[in-house]
């Protein structure tokens, strides 16, 4: 989770209250205080609240929580003067683009650092390390609209940020620190994304690096913000950045985005989303009979718009910068925060029910201990994935046991995974800049036919990775769990023929292991041999290991 440094001078100015009050109350909105110093406090905000990743966002939330300024924040937006056109050739590379202009911002060295920190934290929290979302912030005075978002040949040259000499885009990926770190996001395309102004000056090579021409300094007052990516999380990131700048006194201005075929978007879209919440839903989760008036009060403290429709229903307006409100449960959670968990009365259970570790937890602890002892690092990726990752990249046929997300917010999260291995290979693809060998595992959930299962999977990548290595790991795991097993020839297309095997226990197939097929390795843009295994442990849960 991101740790945000909040300077007291900024906090007190933006909240209108003293640092002692802030330090005492800020954990109640969903944060842990990591460090308290004379000039600043380091706070770890929960990853579901990227709108709090800046001093401006945290101050906005605290003003409501402290009853200094409640209700839905409103931001005036001026008509557009700037436009940007999107070329057809960029749509298969990085198709989503969100833009805005913010004028009249007064910067100091600390506020510039705060903005850059917000940018990088959003890259992590919303952007999956820039894969889904990358943000560019530019000094507008040095470039001339209209802008163009397009794909160009890798030989195209410009001066990247913090450099003084021109470099080709190929050289940037090979030599620039940011280029080598994020090259895997674009290197497999024939052309690379770029944003140019009317005079062919470079604003950005997303998601890699900005041009040096638009560097933000303390003299900067007017900003152009671009957010590119693979899904609608782009627009949420844009809203978070522009509203943070508006909290510091900036004036937001629309930008016209002209897409291929003449479709036009006018961004940012800060219209709140509306939801209907009932007193029954609140009682079901909080166990309290709150009136609609009390519900409205607490929602407004948490910076929602809220109005009672009758004695049982409330219309809620969700700010456009809130990425975490996916269900009414999320609204009730915020009501509980506003009401104060400390004010919710404790009810002692009528019966004595001592707890104990769940069988799944016992199994997980045992397997984790074994895998760590074998030299593997535990990872915990998301369980949401896509058909492309789950099936296509693994060279496996699509199956009918998939549970789909009804309203996915991105093309990367359209279904619940049916297997763990694709997630592990994704993690390897995001860590190619790190030293080899890399050995990772997960004991995690999969869903098949709407039934949750528990799988353990592991992968290892290095030049000498082979069938014998993964066989030894599977054998060690099975022996430590005291499970007699046998192996048979496998036909799993994700693995190389002749170097793959299925694992059976008591005549039932438990999983598969082997060397991954070169096509699978290529699909995940990996450059070395990879081996792995996955075992379904569901039938073993609760049995003595």
From Swiss-Prot:
InterPro entries: aa-tRNA-synth_II/BPL/LPL, B3/B4_tRNA-bd, DNA-bd_dom_put_sf, Phe-tRNA-ligase_IIc_bsu, Phe-tRNA-synth_IIc_bsu_arc_euk, Phe-tRNA_synthase-like_B3/B4, Phe_tRNA_ligase_beta2_arc, PheRS_beta_core
Domain B5 stretches: 270-346
UniProt superkingdom: Archaea
GO CC terms: phenylalanine-tRNA ligase complex
Compartment(s) of residence: Cytoplasm
Cofactor list: Mg(2+)
GO molecular function, one term: magnesium ion binding
EC number per UniProt: 6.1.1.20
UniProt keyword list: Aminoacyl-tRNA synthetase, ATP-binding, Cytoplasm, Ligase, Magnesium, Metal-binding, Nucleotide-binding, Protein biosynthesis
CDD domains reported for this sequence: PheRS_beta_core
Sequence positions that bind Mg(2+): 324, 330, 333-334
Enzyme class, UniProt record, top EC level: ligase
GO biological process: phenylalanyl-tRNA aminoacylation
Entry-linked Pfam families: B5, tRNA_synthFbeta
Catalysed reaction, written as an equation: tRNA(Phe) + L-phenylalanine + ATP = L-phenylalanyl-tRNA(Phe) + AMP + diphosphate + H(+)
PANTHER family: PHENYLALANINE--TRNA LIGASE BETA SUBUNIT, PHENYLALANYL-TRNA SYNTHETASE BETA CHAIN AND LEUCINE-RICH REPEAT-CONTAINING PROTEIN 47
Family: Belongs to the phenylalanyl-tRNA synthetase beta subunit family. Type 2 subfamily.
Assembly and oligomerization: Tetramer of two alpha and two beta subunits.
Protein name: Phenylalanine--tRNA ligase beta subunit
Protein species of origin: Methanosarcina acetivorans (strain ATCC 35395 / DSM 2834 / JCM 12185 / C2A)
């Amino acid at each position: 989770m991101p740790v945000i440094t909040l300077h007291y001078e900024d906090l007190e100015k933006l909240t209108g209250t003293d640092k002692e009050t802030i330090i005492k109350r800020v954990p109640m909105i969903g944060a842990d205080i990591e460090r308290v110093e004379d000039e600043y406090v380091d706070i770890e905000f929960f990853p579901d609240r990227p709108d709090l990743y800046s001093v401006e966002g945290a101050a906005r939330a605290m003003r409501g929580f402290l009853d200094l300024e409640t209700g839905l924040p409103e931001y005036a937006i001026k008509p557009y003067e700037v436009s940007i056109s999107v070329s057809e050739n960029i749509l298969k590379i990085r198709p989503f683009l969100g833009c805005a202009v913010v004028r009249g911002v007064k910067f100091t060295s600390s506020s510039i650092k705060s903005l850059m920190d917000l940018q990088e934290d959003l890259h992590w929290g919303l952007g999956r390390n820039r894969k889904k979302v990358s943000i560019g912030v530019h000094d507008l005075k040095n470039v001339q609209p209209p802008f163009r978002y397009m794909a160009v040949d890798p030989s195209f040259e410009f001066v990247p940020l913090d450099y003084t000499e021109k470099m080709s885009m190929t050289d940037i990926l090979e030599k620039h620190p940011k280029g080598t770190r994020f090259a895997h996001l674009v290197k497999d395309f024939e052309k690379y994304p770029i944003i140019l102004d009317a005079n062919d000056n470079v604003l950005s090579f997303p998601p890699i690096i900005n041009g040096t021409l638009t560097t933000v300094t303390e003299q900067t007052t007017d900003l152009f913000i671009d957010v590119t990516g693979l899904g609608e999380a782009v627009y949420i990131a844009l809203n978070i950045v522009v509203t943070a700048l508006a909290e510091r006194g900036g004036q937001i201005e629309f930008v016209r985005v002209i897409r291929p075929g003449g479709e036009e978007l006018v961004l940012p879209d800060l219209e709140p989303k509306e939801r209907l919440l009932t007193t029954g839903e609140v009682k079901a989760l909080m166990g309290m009979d709150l009136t609609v008036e009390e519900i409205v009060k607490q929602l407004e403290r948490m910076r929602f718009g809220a109005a009672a429709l009758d004695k049982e229903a409330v219309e809620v307006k969700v700010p456009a910068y809130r990425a975490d409100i996916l269900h009414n449960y999320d609204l009730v959670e915020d009501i509980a925060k506003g009401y104060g968990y400390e004010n919710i009365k404790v009810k002692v259970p009528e019966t004595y029910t001592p707890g104990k570790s769940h069988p799944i937890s016992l199994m997980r602890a045992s397997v984790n201990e074994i895998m760590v002892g074998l030299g593997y690092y535990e990872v915990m990726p998301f369980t949401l994935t896509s058909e492309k990752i789950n099936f296509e990249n693994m060279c496996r046929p699509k199956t009918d046991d998939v549970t789909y997300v009804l309203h996915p917010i991105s093309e990367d999260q359209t279904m619940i995974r049916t297997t763990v291995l694709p997630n592990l290979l994704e993690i390897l693809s995001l860590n190619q800049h790190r030293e080899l060998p890399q050995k990772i595992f997960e004991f995690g959930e999969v869903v098949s036919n709407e039934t949750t299962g528990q799988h353990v999977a592991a992968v290892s990548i290095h030049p000498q990775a082979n069938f014998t290595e993964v066989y030894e790991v599977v054998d060690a795991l099975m022996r430590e769990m005291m499970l007699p097993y046998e192996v048979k020839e496998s036909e799993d297309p994700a693995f190389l023929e002749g170097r793959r095997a299925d694992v059976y226990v008591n005549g039932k197939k438990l999983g598969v292991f082997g060397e991954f097929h070169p096509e699978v390795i290529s699909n995940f843009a990996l450059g070395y041999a990879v081996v792995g295994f996955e075992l379904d442990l569901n039938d073993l849960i609760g049995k003595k290991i």
